[in-house]
Amino acid sequence: MNHRGIPALFLDRDGVINEEIGYLSRSEQVRWVPGIFSLVRTAQARGYRVVVVTNQAGIARGLYTTEEFETLMDWMRERFLAEGCALDAVYHCPFHPVHGLGSWKQDHVDRKPSPGMLWRAAKDLGLDLAQSVLVGDRCSDIAAARAAGLRQAFLKRGTEPASCPDDAILIDTLAEVQAWLESQPEPR
């Protein structure tokens, strides 16, 4: 699926925007990953839409509700605005194929490594996936980026083995992604 339109910077949430703690559900648990606000400001200045794509198995497992997730994301959006940047859209997958409870137990097309959230964002926002990039911290993030035909994928070291991506760029900090964006020609 290739849409001619606006490029996007897709961000996984846990481990990329905020430190991974396992089933984040409240604002007081948030610890920002260093460099996240600067990265988002740079991406937006260069014409990228910033889109969060996040699996949320905590909803499927009954650890928190969709409403609690949305409240937390509203708070996060306010924090980004206070830092002079914005999250243009947030897509989440509340399903889990094994550990989901009731109707949450399913292998949904939106759950990474499937590219469903990326495809929906492209359709909803008029994005050009072939000019878009993704930053994730798991092999499932990279697989979703590849399946959607994204231009580039970055794997933040720490959560998964460095051998999982095929041609993803391994990074230690978000400043590396920011430098990469700054080195690229302006999107058309």
Predicted regions span which residues?
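Acidic, Mg2+-coordinating phosphoryl-transfer loop and its flanking beta/alpha structural elements
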Residues: 130-169
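Short acidic-hydrophobic, aromatic-tinged amphipathic segments that line or gate anion-handling sites
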Residues: 169-176
